[in-house]
């Protein structure tokens, strides 16, 4: 019978070290990740993607955490230092940043497995019984204690968190596994072009979420073997998991948030369309991802900013926002904002109309602009009278990126402004 006693769970989380892999580029986000890693991507009006796995760790009772960084890491490191520096080492708590440092070779991190291997000495110093390896570039809420309990009680060497996804969505994007009735993994293929479907549903498959639990010494042994294999790509999905499923106990854990009915939310915001859509979903009256749940808060760096302000109330010049998230420091000055997410210190000037927009911090939209279904990168200044999102041929001609679903990306470079905002 499963043991879910508070003492059992608290012992598990205390004996666990979490390693968040946060070095990914996010190439399918194109210019949006030219100056930041995917885990440093802004989300939901005030957060960054990395805040979600970090908050899940803290809320689950896991207080020893390493954040592995590599690509364009400055903004990510700065955010973690500012927002997550409150842990007390004397109480056994820590959030450590682990940049690529050529610890065991002259190469930078060569893959997900190599990123962990090069930090073995740091993990060993923590003396954990279990190591939880987490993807740093997904938006979700999850109580990791449930997965830890399932791992311990199954006697597994490794546990892989998974969920059912459409075959078309998984193709080329996710690791796909086959499992026996007891959830033991019997087959695994990394990002196949033609994923194996579920026996009971030809339209869906079982996809890895990139979250793993290992027994510590077992993990170290497998990483050493992988490091000695000259043909390995140093990747958990491509190399480690396929090599161990036959001779070792690898189990799948079906993703569930552990936060109650209807709370199982997980999104890969790895494309411009999915990033835009995930932000738009937050605007419904009862969004599937509840950022207002005080029982499972999402922590982040809190800037000291004045409240949002809406000014002018004339018939043709009324500052207003409907069905929107408007963050601190924003000023809506005689403009109309509808179904949009505005991050900190955005200013929308008079007579402009904004709809379906995700606007990152420090953006200024000057007068008489009409913007629809756009993502505006940090620090942009939209010139007066500009119309974007209403004619995609014109948008492309001006150098903006238009997605297959009609979302328009605007960056400082596209506007001819100096680069470098993170």
Curated annotation (Swiss-Prot):
**Pathway, per UniProt?**
Glycan biosynthesis; glycogen biosynthesis
Family, according to the entry, reads as follows:
Belongs to the bacterial/plant glucose-1-phosphate adenylyltransferase family.
Q: Which GO terms describe its biological process?
A: glycogen biosynthetic process
Biological role stated in the UniProt entry:
Involved in the biosynthesis of ADP-glucose, a building block required for the elongation reactions to produce glycogen. Catalyzes the reaction between ATP and alpha-D-glucose 1-phosphate (G1P) to produce pyrophosphate and ADP-Glc.
Query: Looking at the record's lineage, which domain of life comes first?
Result: Bacteria
Q: Does the keyword Zinc apply?
A: no
Q: Name one Pfam family in it.
A: Hexapep_GlmU
User: Which key words are in the record?
Assistant: ATP-binding, Carbohydrate metabolism, Glycogen biosynthesis, Glycogen metabolism, Nucleotide-binding, Nucleotidyltransferase, Transferase
**Reaction catalysed by this chain?**
alpha-D-glucose 1-phosphate + ATP + H(+) = ADP-alpha-D-glucose + diphosphate
GO terms for MF: ATP binding; glucose-1-phosphate adenylyltransferase activity
- Which ranges does the record mark as transmembrane? none
Supply the InterPro entries for this chain: ADP-Glc_PPase, ADP_Glu_pyroP_CS, GlgC_bac, GlmU/GlgC-like_hexapep, NTP_transferase_dom, Nucleotide-diphossugar_trans, Trimer_LpxA-like_sf
Q: Assembly and interactions?
A: Homotetramer.
EC number assigned by the record: 2.7.7.27
Q: Does the keyword rRNA processing apply?
A: no
What stretch or stretches form a coiled coil here? none
Record-given protein name: Glucose-1-phosphate adenylyltransferase
């Amino acid at each position: 019978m499963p043991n879910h006693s508070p003492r059992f769970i608290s012992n598990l989380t205390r004996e666990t070290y979490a390693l968040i892999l946060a070095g990914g580029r996010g190439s399918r986000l194109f210019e949006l990740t030219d100056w930041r890693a995917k885990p440093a991507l802004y989300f939901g009006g005030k957060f960054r993607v990395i805040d979600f796995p970090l908050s899940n760790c803290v809320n689950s009772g896991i207080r020893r955490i390493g954040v592995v960084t590599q690509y364009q890491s400055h903004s990510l490191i700065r955010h973690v230092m500012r927002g997550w520096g409150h842990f007390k080492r004397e109480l056994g708590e820590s959030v450590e940043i682990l940049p690529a440092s050529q610890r065991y070779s002259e190469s930078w991190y060569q893959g997900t497995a190599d990123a962990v291997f090069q930090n073995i000495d740091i993990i060993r110093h923590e003396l954990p019984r279990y190591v939880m390896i987490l993807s740093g570039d997904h938006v979700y809420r999850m109580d990791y204690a449930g997965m830890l309990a399932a791992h311990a009680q199954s006697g597994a060497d490794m546990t892989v968190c998974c969920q059912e996804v459409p075959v078309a969505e998984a193709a080329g994007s996710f690791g796909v596994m086959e499992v026996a009735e007891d959830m033991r993994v019997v087959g695994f293929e990394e990002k196949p072009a033609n994923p194996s479907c579920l026996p009971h549903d030809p339209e869906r498959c079982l996809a890895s979420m990139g979250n793993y639990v290992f027994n510590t010494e077992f993990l170290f042994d497998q990483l050493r073997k992988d490091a000695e294999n000259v043909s390995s790509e140093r990747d958990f999905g491509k190399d480690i998991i396929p090599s161990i499923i036959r001779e070792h106990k690898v189990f799948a854990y079906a993703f569930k948030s552990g936060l109650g009915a209807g709370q199982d939310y997980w999104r890969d915001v790895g494309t411009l369309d999915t990033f835009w859509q995930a932000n738009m979903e937050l605007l419904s009256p009862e969004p599937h991802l509840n950022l207002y749940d005080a029982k499972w808060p999402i922590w982040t760096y809190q800037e000291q900013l004045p409240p949002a302000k809406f000014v002018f109330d004339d018939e043709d010049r009324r500052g207003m926002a409907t069905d929107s998230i408007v963050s601190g420091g924003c000023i809506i000055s005689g403009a109309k904002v509808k179904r949009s997410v505005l991050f900190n210190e955005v200013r929308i000037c008079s007579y402009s109309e904004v709809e379906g927009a995700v606007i990152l911090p420090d953006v200024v939209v000057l007068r008489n602009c009409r913007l629809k279904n756009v993502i505006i990168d940090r620090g942009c200044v939209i010139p007066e009278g500009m119309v974007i999102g209403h004619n995609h041929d014109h948008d492309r001609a001006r150098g903006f990126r238009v997605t297959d679903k009609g979302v328009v990306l605007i960056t400082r470079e596209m506007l001819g402004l100096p680069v470098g905002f993170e």
